Structure formats: structure tokens, C-alpha cells
Amino acid sequence: TPCGTLFPYTTLFRSLGLFLSIIVHELSHSLVARNFGMPIKGITLFIFGGVAEMNDEPPSAKSEFFMAIAGPLASIIIGGIFFLVNVTGQAIMPEPAGAVIQYLALINFVLAGFNLLPAFPLDGGRVFRSILWAWKKNLKWATRISSRIGTGFGVLLIVLGGLSFFGGNIVGGIWWVLIGFFMLSASRMSYQQLLLRKALEGEQIGRAHV
């Protein structure tokens, strides 16, 4: 039967759909960044999205805001499409196909929600930094505040992952700990890179005046 044929491939289709959803999420960042003249050096992917690596800081708070919000908006749109497909086609879809569609709708909403957390360098953290930047007109200060929040969030994930691990959820606990360490490292590194760029800019300006 069609259902029996689809069941063995359900996990494969879910995994493929998740991977493609993350790719679209990150490509949305890249397209908006290119529109603002910001080249993307690379993208680091992980289970709940990714982090775009740029050669330089965004030219303005406005450009960072739109680049950061593009990914979550893309995920919300994709999730909405899968949700509508599930609602309208539930009566005629085979059960395994319906399960995959439901999963992809849910995972895209989760992807958007997680990335909108105000923890730098997640998308939400970049949105928050752009708001602070626009408010104080000080990128260094905005990055320092956002980076501290990102660091705190990383520590929180590590603690929750440890509790989950010792509570019996071994795989889930390990995932949260790994993501927490990634967040911790990325948030600190982002601020250090900004300080280095500012120092190099100051050195170049000093040499130009010699």
C-alpha cells in the first residue's frame, strides 16, 4: 500500500526537509546581506539554524536588522505553508506524508522561535544589537551588551543540558550542552573580533596621519 511504502522513508524525508529549511533560512540572510553590500564569508550550520560569518560588521543598524530578521521570517513563511498544506490536504494525504508535513510545519516555527531569542549571535541577538545600535549610535557598546546576553544564554543551555543528561535524557542533554558551548564561544568571539577590527582601524588611521 502507499502508506506502507512511505513509512520507511518518513525519517529520511523529515531530515531532508529540516536540512532544506535551514538552508533556506540561511540563504535569506545572504540575499538580504548582498542587497546591502555585505559579503558573507561563510555559514556555520547547526541543528537549530546557523550563524552567518561576515568579513566586516554591517554598515548600519538598519542593514543588520533586516539581514537578521530575514531568516526567522523565511522560517515562519515555510512553516505557514506546510501548516496550510496539512490543514487543507489532511483528508487526502497518506498518514506518513501528513506526519512529515506536520513535523516540517512545527520544526520551522521552532526554528524561527529559537533564532529569535535575544542571544547574540543568534538572529534575535543581532536584531537586539541593531536596536541598541540605532538607539545609542554605538556599535561597540551594543555588541558588548548583546555578547554578554549571548554568553549568559550559552551558560544557561549548558546547565540545562547537564541537568537533562543526568535526568536520563542523554542525547538531548548532550545536544543542549554542545549548542550552549557553541553559543558561549561564538558570542565571546564576536565581541573580540569587533575589538580587533576597531584596533586595526585605529592603527591604520594613525599611520595615515603620520
Predicted stretch roles:
Residues 6-209:
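Hydrophobic transmembrane alpha-helices and their immediate loop junctions
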